[in-house]
Amino acid sequence: MFIKRFFNLVFAAVLFTWVPPAFTQTLEEVVVTAQIREQSLQDVPISVSAIAGEDIADRSVDNLQSLSASVPNFMVVETQIDTSISIRGVRSGANKGFEQSVPMNFDGVVYPRSQLARTPLVDLERVEVLRGPQPTLFGKNAIGGAVSITSAKPTEEFEGKFSTSHESDHGEDQSLLVLSGALSDNLLGRLTVSTREMDGWITNTNMKRIEPQRDETYIRGQLAWTAGDVDFNLKVETADFDSVGYAMEALAPQDGYSLVFAGPIAVETNEDWVRSSGETFSQNTMDNFVLTANYPMDGGGTLTSITGHVEYDSYEVLDVDYVGLEILDGTNQTEKYDQWSQEIRYTSPGGEDVDYIVGAYFQTADVDVTDYVPLGSFLALAGPPVSLLVGTNWDRLYAQSSDMYSVFGQADINLQGNWRLTLGARYSNEDKDGSRKLTLDGTGTALAGSPLLNVLWAGVLNVGPHDVASSRSENSFDPMVRLSYDLSDNSQMYVSYTEGSKAGGFDIRGNSIPGTPLVSSAGGWEFEEENATNIEWGYKMKSDRASFDFTYFTTEYDDLQTSVFDGVLGFKVGNASAAELDGFEMQGRYLLTDNLEFYASMASLDYKFTDWKTVSAHTVRLPQMVFIVTDLVPALFLLLKIQRMLDLHTILFYQITGCLMLI
C-alpha cells in the first residue's frame, strides 16, 4: 500500500447572464427536495449537497463525472466497460448484473443502469447528492446514497436562451438552446436542445488520433397544464451520447510485465498523455418519458402519480487488453434496457404535529446484454497449441426480466419541546428471471469442430461453454429512525439509524459456472442480497450570512456484492462477508461582503473490507482478518472556493481542491 497525493489549483472566470436584479446582504437560501417536500437545505437532517442549475451551467459542468469533482465523498468514473457512481466509497462493481448502489432519480423516475450516468446535465433546476443509505424515499438498492436531478420547468413568461462556447486545448464545442413560455391560456411548454463535441487530449499512437472524442445531442420537451384541480407535467427526452477512445493510460507496470512486453512488442507505460490501444468506441441512445400528476386533496395534502418509461440501447467496441497489441481487440458489447414504473404517493400538507408521506411503487424491466470476444494474432507468438486459438471467439448472451413492488412511508413527529422523531420504512418484493449462454466458435480455423477448442479455451483462458437459467425472489424491509433536536431557530442536531438493502441477482459477465468441464477455477452465476446498517450524527446551522453542516457516519455492510479478478481473463462475482466504513463530511458558506462569498467543504473516509470470502492474488491476510482498501475512495477531500460578483454580467471564482488518495 502506498499514499499518493495530488493537489489541483483551478482558476476560472465565467461570463453569464445574471437574473437576480441586485445583490443581497443575506446568504441565498438553498431549497432541496431530499425528503420529497421543498425544504431549506439547512432544515433537512440528512448529509446532502445541492448544486443549483445556474451554478452547473456557469461552471460548464456537462455530466456527473465533472460535477463529482466538487462534491465531498462523491465520485463518478467512466471506464472502458462501465460507469461507476460512488458515494462514501460505496459503488457497484463493473458487472451489469449488479443493481446500482447509488441510483439516479431524474424527475421522480429511477435511472437504474450505470450507462445512464453519462446522461448530459443541461437546463436543470438543481442536482442533489444524498449520502448514506436512502431506501425509504429513493427506493430499494439506494444502499450508498442517491443522486436526485430536477430539470427546469416550463414558465408562464416567455424565456429564451442560446449559448455557445469553444475550448481550444481539447477542441470542445458546446451549444444550448432553451425556449419556455405559455402556448395557450392553460398550456405551458419548454424545449431544451444541447449539443457537445470534443476532440480529446490523449494521443493514441496505435490509432493515430486524439482521444477521447465526444459527440452528444440531447433534446428535452415538456408540457405543463391543469385539468380541473389536477396539475400535469409531461416530459419527453431523447439523447445520443457517443464517444471514441477513453481517457486512460497504461501505467506502473508490475511483476514481470516489462520482461514480457519488451522489444518489438513493448507497451508504452509513461505518464505522458500518450496511450497505445486498439479501436474503442461507445454509442448510446436514450428515449424516456415521465408523466407527473399532482392532485390537491381535502385537508391540504397532495396525491402524486409518476408514470415513467426508460429505454436505451448501447453498442460498444472495446480493446479489453488495453494495449496496442492484437490480443482481445474488437470485443463487441451491446445492452438493451426497457423499464416501466409507476409511483403513487400521498404527502400531508406539512407544518402539523405529524407530517407524513406514504406511497407505493411498481417497476417492470427487461435487459439484454451480448458480448462477442475474438482472439487476436498476438497469441501466435506463443506457438502451438496456444497459437491455434487465433481467430476463434466466444459469444455470450444474457437476458433478464424483473418485477418489483414496494410500499413505503415516512412520518415526522413533533414531540414536546424542540424534539422531533422521524420514522420511515420501505417493504419491497422483487422477482427476477435470468439466463446466460456462452458458446465457442472456431469457424475458419484449425479448431473448427474439434474438441480441442474447448480444451484450449478452458486451459489457457479459463473459459468454458455453458447454458444456465434460473429465477429468484426476495423480500426486504428497510427501516429508518431519526431523532432531531432544535438548538435554536437556526440550528439543529440529529442522530439517525438506517438499514438498507440491495437486490441480489445473476452474473452477466461470467465465463463459466460451477460444474463447467475443464476450467481451473469455475465462475459464479447467482449472488445474494447486500445489506447495510448506517448510524449518523449531524449538526446544521444557518444565519443571514453563514451556513454550516457537519455529519459523522459509521456503516457496516454484510454480504457485500463483489467482483474479483480470476487471474486470467474473467471476474468471479460473489458476496464478501463484511465491510466497514466511517468518516465525516462538512460544508459551509459565508457571505464576506455583499458580492463576495466563501465556500468550503471537507470529507474524510476510512473504508475497509473485512473477513473476505473470495480472495484475489493481491489480498493481504492478517490473523482472523483480511483488509483491503477499496478503490475510488479519497481518504481526505478538501474544496475551497471564493466567488465574487464583479458586476451584473461577470462572476469570478477561485477554486482550490485537494485529495489524499489511499491506493
Where are these regions (language model features)?
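Conserved C-terminal beta-signal and adjacent last beta-strands/turns
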Residues: T24, S180, T334-T347, G351-G359, ...
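Acidic, small-polar-rich N-terminal luminal/periplasmic segments of exported/outer-membrane proteins
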Residues: L27-E157, W537
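Outer-membrane beta-barrel translocator/receptor signature
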Residues: I85, Q100-S101, R113, V122-R131, ...
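Periplasmic-side early beta-strands and strand-to-turn transitions of outer-membrane beta-barrels
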Residues: S148, E156-F158, S165, L177-G278, ...
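Repeated loop/turn-to-beta-strand initiation elements of outer-membrane beta-barrel proteins
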Residues: F158, N186-G189, D229-F232, G300-L303, ...
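Structural signature of Gram-negative outer-membrane beta-barrels, strongest in the C-terminal barrel
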Residues: A224-T226, Y346-P349, Y361, Y398-E556, ...
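Membrane-embedded beta-barrel scaffold of Gram-negative outer-membrane proteins
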Residues: N288, T292-P296, T302-L318, D486, ...
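Gram-negative outer-membrane beta-barrel transporters
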Residues: Y356, G417-L421, S547-Y557, G574-H649
